């Protein structure tokens, strides 16, 4: 006996979306991020770098530490924006968050590739960073649309400052890493501006200070581990 669709196009075993599907989708997304499966939609910025003399071992270690920090930042960005979007009830805001997360995938892939070029690896604590950031994103979204967008804007503002510091600290000879960080900084500025235009409000000073403290903890740990 065979089972066939009717002339109306009805499929008797078509799958209906269940209440746990969004959860399964987020778990799948997390596994893809943490497994290093991300691929960029845009060209690799480092490809445009001029050939330079080889880096010394010390320069490579320092550059790898900084790029590992940047990679952790992109893991956190994926989790943060997915968490914010998951709890957001405003469709336009949710789309803005998901669009930013999609662009950050490029950054994730670029940092991962550069770490490989430098003979290094991502942070061993990435699962912890992801889980914490996703939870933080959900909490930010529960604070309301204006604060949710304000959190996005403040996050990007602090990331811009952090990337500025990396541009000052990276070896001048490491033009490949510098090209990547420069492009990332430009993208973060656009994300911040988008959040502000969409209605993001400034966060209270204690919240901004707590965000900076958490960022310092993450960066100082990820540089080594």
UniProtKB/Swiss-Prot annotation:
It is a peripheral membrane protein. GO terms for molecular function: 3-demethoxyubiquinol 3-hydroxylase activity; metal ion binding. It holds the Pfam family COQ7. Disulfide bonds: none annotated. Binds 2 iron ions per subunit. SUPFAM superfamilies: Ferritin-like. Pathway: Cofactor biosynthesis; ubiquinone biosynthesis. Its cofactor is Fe cation. Fe cation 2 binds at residues 104, 156, 188, 191. Its EC number is 1.14.99.60. It comes from the Bacteria. CDD domains: DMQH. InterPro entries: COQ7_proteobact (IPR047809), Ferritin-like (IPR012347), Ferritin-like_SF (IPR009078), Ubq_synth_Coq7 (IPR011566). It is found in: Cell membrane. Gene3D superfamilies: 1.20.1260.10. Belongs to the COQ7 family. This is 3-demethoxyubiquinol 3-hydroxylase. It comes from Bordetella petrii (strain ATCC BAA-461 / DSM 12804 / CCUG 43448). The gene is coq7.
């Amino acid at each position: 006996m065979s089972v066939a669709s009717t002339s109306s196009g009805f499929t008797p075993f078509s799958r209906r979306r269940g209440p746990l599907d969004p959860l399964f989708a987020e778990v799948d997304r997390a596994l893809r991020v943490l497994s290093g499966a991300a691929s960029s939609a845009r060209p690799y910025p480092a490809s445009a770098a001029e050939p330079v003399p080889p880096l010394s071992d010390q320069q490579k270690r320092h550059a790898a530490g900084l790029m590992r920090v940047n990679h952790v930042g992109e893991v956190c960005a994926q989790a943060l924006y997915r968490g914010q979007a998951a709890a957001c009830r405003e469709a336009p805001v949710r789309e803005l968050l998901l669009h930013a997360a999609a662009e950050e995938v490029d950054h994730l892939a670029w940092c991962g590739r550069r770490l490989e070029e430098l003979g290094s690896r991502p942070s061993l604590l990435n699962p912890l960073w992801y889980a914490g950031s996703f939870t933080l994103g959900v909490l930010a979204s529960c604070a309301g649309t204006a604060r949710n967008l304000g959190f996005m804007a403040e996050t990007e503002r602090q990331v811009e400052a952090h990337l500025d510091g990396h541009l000052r600290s990276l070896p001048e000879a490491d033009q490949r890493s510098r090209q990547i960080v420069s492009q990332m900084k430009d993208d973060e500025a656009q994300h911040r501006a988008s959040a502000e235009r969409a209605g993001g409000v400034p966060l209270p000073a204690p919240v901004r200070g707590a965000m900076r403290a958490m960022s310092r903890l993450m960066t100082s740990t990820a540089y080594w581990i």
